[in-house]
Regions:
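Anion-binding (especially nucleotide phosphate/pyrophosphate-binding) glycine-rich loop
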Residues: 1-128
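Phosphate/pyrophosphate- and phosphate-bearing ligand-binding catalytic cores of soluble enzymes
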Residues: 14-15, 153-275, 279-280, 284-301
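Structural signature of FAD isoalloxazine-binding scaffolds in flavoprotein oxidoreductases
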Residues: 28-29, 35-40, 67-85, 133-164, ...
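Short, basic and Ser/Thr-rich N-terminal targeting/leader segments
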Residues: 53, 60-62, 146, 217-218, ...
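A generic local secondary-structure boundary/capping motif
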Residues: 66, 107-110, 118-122, 135-142, ...
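Residues embedded in well-ordered beta-strands within globular domains across many folds
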Residues: 87, 119, 151, 293-294
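An N-terminal domain-start capping segment
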Residues: 129-139, 201-205
Length: 301
C-alpha cells in the first residue's frame, strides 16, 4: 500500500505542507507528507506503511521547543495533536494522557481531580509526548518526577510499556530519544491535594511566566540548557548579545536566552543567532552552551 492511499481510509494525510504553520517559531520548511492520526489504529497503519515503503518517519509534538530547518523534512511527518484524551483517576491518584494532549491541559485535569504534582507544567506549551521525550521541566519540577509509565509504539510496529526507571530520564533527556520509539500515552503518578491550593500554585507559576517570558512574540522557549555553575541569561547580557538580531530572529530584551521571531524570521536566522551566541559565550567565558531546543530537517537548497 502507498502512503497516499491511506487517505481513502479516512486518514488525514497531506503533501508538501509548510511546517511553519505548526511551529511556535512560525518558521520551518515543508513536510513531504504530513499526517494527523486520530487514534492508535491510524498511527499503527501509518507506521507500518512507511516501514513497508522505506519512507523516513519524523514525529513532532506541539512543536514548541523545536526548530525545523528551512528545507523542511523528507518522508512522513506525524503530528499527534488529534490524539489528546486525558483521564484522571482520583482513587488511584493518576492521570493518563495521550501523547498529543497538551501538558497544560493535563496539569489542569490533575488540578480538577485534586491531584498534586503537575503544577510546574501549568505554563509549558508542549504536548505530553514532547514533555516525556524532552523530560520537560520548569520551576523546580521535571516530567520524570511524576511519570509512572510510558506507552510507546516502536519503529518495528509493536506496542510496549516502559516503567519510570526504564525511561532513563536525565536533564532534558529520555530513553525514547535513543530508541526512536513513538510515545503514545503517559501515566502520571500524583498525590492527593487541595484543589484550590493546587490551582493557586499553578496561577503563581503562570504569573511568573507572563512576567518574565516574551510571550508576545513567536518563540521556541528557552533555547539553551543551563551549564553547570553558570546562568545563561547573565552571560548573554554581559557579552552584549541581548537584543542582538539576525534577520527576524532576536535574542529577547525581556528574557535573554529566549530567541523570538520579531517578524519574517527564518529557521536559518534562528540557527545563525544561536551559533553566534554559542561562539561568543565560548570566547568570553570558556563555556560551551548546549541547546535545549531540538533542531531537525534539512537545509534549503
Amino acid at each position: 500500500m502507498q502512503l497516499m492511499d491511506l487517505k481513502k481510509q479516512g486518514i488525514d494525510i497531506q503533501e508538501n505542507i509548510p511546517l511553519s504553520r505548526f511551529t511556535f517559531t512560525k518558521t520551518g520548511g515543508p513536510a513531504q507528507y504530513l499526517a494527523f492520526p486520530k487514534n492508535l489504529n491510524e498511527l499503527e497503519l501509518l507506521v507500518d506503511t512507511v516501514k513497508e515503503n522505506n519512507i523516513p518517519l519524523t514525529v513532532i509534538g506541539n512543536a514548541s521547543n523545536l526548530i525545523i530547518r528551512d528545507g523542511g523534512i523528507s518522508g512522513l511527518v506525524l503530528i499527534l495533536t488529534k490524539m489528546d484524551t486525558i483521564v484522571a483517576n482520583k482513587d488511584e491518584a493518576t492521570v493518563t494522557a495521550d501523547a498529543g494532549a497538551r501538558i497544560i491541559d493535563t496539569s489542569e485535569a490533575a488540578c480538577e481531580a485534586g491531584l498534586s504534582g503537575l503544577e510546574f507544567a501549568a505554563g509549558i506549551p508542549g504536548s505530553v509526548g514532547g514533555a516525556v521525550f524532552m523530560n520537560a521541566g520548569a520551576y523546580g519540577g521535571e516530567t520524570e518526577f511524576v511519570i509512572k509509565s510510558v506507552r510507546v509504539l516502536t519503529r518495528t510496529g509493536e506496542f510496549k510499556t516502559y516503567t519510570h526507571d526504564e525511561m532513563e530520564f536525565g536533564y532534558r533527556h529520555s530513553l525514547v530519544q535513543e530508541t526512536g520509539d513513538i510515545v503514545v500515552s503517559a501515566t502520571f503518578g500524583l498525590e492527593p491535594g487541595d484543589k484550590w491550593a493546587i490551582k493557586a500554585k499553578m496561577e503563581y507559576f503562570n504569573g511568573l511566566r507572563r512576567a518574565k517570558q516574551p510571550l508576545e512574540y513567536p518563540s521556541c522557549g528557552s533555547v539553551f540548557k543551563r551549564p553547570a555553575g553558570h546562568f545563561v541569561g547573565p552571560m548573554i547580557i554581559k557579552a552584549g548579545l541581548q537584543g542582538k538580531r539576525i534577520g527576524g530572529a532576536e535574542d529577547s530584551m525581556k528574557h535573554a536566552g529566549f530567541i523570538v521571531n520579531v517578524g519574517g524570521a527564518t529557521a536559518t536566522d534562528y540557527l545563525d543567532l544561536i551559533h553566534l551566541i554559542q561562539k561568543t559565550i565560548k570566547k568570553d567565558f570558556g563555556v560551551d552552551l548546549q541547546t535545549e531546543v531540538r533542531t531537525i530537517g534539512k537545509e534549503k537548497d
